[in-house]
Amino acid sequence: GNISTTALGLSEGIMWDFNKRAVSMDILDFYQIEKDKVPDIVPSIGVQGKISKENCLNFGLVDNVTISYRAGDQPNNAFSLNVLNDGEIAATAGTSAVIYCVTKKDISDPQNRVNTFLHCNDDINNKRNGVLLCINGSGIAYSWLKKTLKINSYFEMDNLSEEVNSSEGLSFFPFGNGSERLFNHNKNLNAMINGLDFNIHNNSHIIRSVLEGIAFSLCYGIEYLRNMGLNIDSVKVGDSNLFKSKIFKEVFVNVSKTKLYVYNTDGSLGAARGAALGSGDYNNEEEALSSLKLIEKLNPQESKSMDASYKNWKKLLNKLI
């Protein structure tokens, strides 16, 4: 078969020169990679090739299946949410949590706390970069808690979290899934819970504190992105993972001071629509995403108690880092 790659893929592999809009010869030279080893570059959204007849037969596919879309998980999540233009922002909170900002700016961080690469619909006439901020400890913390407390479902956990009005002074830090690039020197803080009182706290408080701690981590990351010059006043998410939790959504919105738009989509639907667009079944991006439905919108509400909890959380975090 024929080997090919995309500019997006090269940028994710730090082999793209954003200024020259070409393969980075500096990187190739440094690692002594010959230029002819770089495959042909094809568009992320568009016909890239076809699956061989033999492989179609092996996988039970019809003949001549076209490969017409490829993107990393976060550019694809953004595409699924119609986050395609400068200033638009997508998020997810699965095993890890991500804020993904589309911008026409060439933004970079010397300390690598965020990653910048081309967005899936970048082209020479309309620059679109994706700036990615990741929190490794997110849904994995909620999953760990579910197993540890032996609770049957996330739905039950969400209900328990709503039985209390606050976490009563508990502060949770979800950094137990390896090093966090958001902190200087890619620091591994480990997860921890602070302020536990055996006479006050029960499962509901602990569950709520975990949801708050994960949301606070994203809000902390948003502060950093804003300091980089990115305007973040609204975020789009799919109706999945931690964004199914009422408490998580409310804490995220009220502390970050951003509007939240929840849509009936996920990454698999986005990939299917991207492939259909790339193969010509849709005429443009707008048509491909026309069936996207907004199912919930949340506006930030003033919450002095939650702001105080976040302030205390950051104070404790600063001691850890």
Task: For each feature predicted by the language model, list its residue ranges.
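Short beta-strand to alpha-helix junction loop
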Residues: 17-20, 44-48
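Active-site core segments that coordinate phosphate-bearing ligands/cofactors
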Residues: 1-4, 9-32, 53-236, 241-321
